[in-house]
Swiss-Prot record:
Binding site for K(+): 43
Gene3D superfamilies in the record: 3.30.300.10
Protein name (record): S-adenosylmethionine synthase
Keywords: ATP-binding, Cytoplasm, Magnesium, Metal-binding, Nucleotide-binding, One-carbon metabolism, Potassium, Transferase
Gene: metK
């Protein structure tokens, strides 16, 4: 029997890098609401008392960057300088310019179907049958821990919790199936007046136990709750935050490969984002159809060219048909040209802000999580 350990981490919506991601996607959504075919590449930097929003935008829309930024920070929960950041008093700097016409001429076409890719690059999609959402268990439960932290914090149940938090889970695998949890790490920001003992006890009872299945926990499972003992200074006061710095948290927790491109702040003409979503859609439908237990797809593009330069699939020995057959099925049932996948997943609309925390995949509310092609894939064999 083959055994191994695998670890993934997640971070909360109050983590500095995630604040940046959420601001970038809030700007994107506000623009897409007015101008669905806008070109947006929005980057955000946050540090003590300051938010810098920059990038390139081509649009007919007008949005109030300062108001959007403050509202986003407020919704996350940074409402007082005692927390290390205050939505009402932080400086908001706007450094947004226009998209280069050299890029634009390679993307826009008279025929929408021939729209070229916004850049070269390679993107991966992945799915696995090890959880109900067809995602790897380590990243799925790491996300659920920090989501629970936010839920408990916002409900007021533990009113001393603060927005910044991180989680990490090490799973035990036997024959590529998760069978238990070896270690759990959860660090959460808290107010100055609460003791470390209180934090550890409450986090275990209110966050960890309600989230992690008891059958995966045993006497050998190790728990590290605020292992440094104190986490009062957090958020942008503790670390600066930058859009696109949590690409493994955003995807599969390291279980699958990554092409390197970040998602947040990018409109769907950027294949870094849209093709990664389409890759997840393809891989999930292949697994949902029972054609493989695990599936990873790679798609690549050239700037200004509509057709993908390559499509390849790896099922890690779990496929019921060979990978060449799967690639042929993908070409038959999925349009992976930039505009084709935008239409397939209905991406030209303001749906991106919620993706910017707790992972872009494994959440049923997003269109790339649908398994509506599974039956057709199965029937094609």
């Amino acid at each position: 029997m083959a055994t191994h350990l695998f670890t993934s981490e997640s971070v909360s919506e109050g983590h500095p890098d995630k604040i940046a991601d959420q601001i970038s996607d809030a700007v994107l959504d506000a623009i897409l609401e007015q101008d669905p075919r806008a070109r947006v590449a929005c980057e955000t930097y946050v540090k003590t008392g300051m938010v810098l929003v920059g990038g390139e935008v081509t649009t007919s829309a007008w949005v109030d960057i300062e108001e959007l930024t403050r509202n986003t920070v407020k919704e996350i929960g940074y409402t007082h300088s005692d927390m290390g950041f205050d939505a009402d008093s932080c400086a908001v700097l706007n450094a947004i310019g226009k998209q280069s016409p050299d890029i634009n001429q390679g993307v826009d076409r008279a025929s929408l179907e021939e729209q070229g890719a916004g850049d070269q690059g390679l993107m991966f999609g992945y799915a696995s049958d090890e959880t109900d959402v067809l995602m790897p268990a380590p990243i799925t439960y790491s996300h659920r821990l920090v989501q629970k932290q936010a839920e408990v914090r916002k409900s007021g149940k533990l009113d001393w919790l603060r927005p910044d938090a991180k989680s990490q889970i090490t799973f035990k695998y036997e024959n590529d199936k998760p069978v238990g949890i070896d270690a759990v790490v959860l660090s959460t920001q808290h107010c100055d007046s609460v003791s470390t003992e209180t934090v550890r006890e409450a986090v275990m009872e209110e966050i960890i136990k309600p989230v992690l299945p008891s059958e995966w926990i045993d006497g050998n499972t190790r728990f590290h709750i605020n292992p440094t003992g104190r986490f009062v200074i957090g958020g942008p006061m503790g670390d600066c935050g930058l859009t696109g710095r949590k690409i493994i948290v955003d995807t599969y927790g390291g279980m699958a490969r990554h092409g390197g491109g970040a998602f947040s702040g990018k409109d769907p003409s950027k294949v870094d984002r849209s093709a990664a979503y389409a890759g997840r859609y393809v891989a999930k439908n292949i697994v949902a159809a029972g054609l493989a237990k695990r599936c990873e797809i790679q798609v690549s593009y050239a700037i200004g060219v509509a057709e993908p330069t390559s499509i390849s699939i790896d099922t890690f020995g779990t496929g019921v048909v060979d990978e060449k057959t799967l690639v042929a099925l993908v070409r038959e049932h999925f349009d992976l040209r930039p505009y084709g996948l935008i239409q397939m997943l209905d991406l030209e609309r303001p749906i991106y802000r919620p993706t910017a925390a707790y992972g872009h995949f494994g959440r049923d509310e997003f269109p790339w999580e649908a398994t509506d092609k599974a039956q057709a894939l199965k029937a094609s064999l």
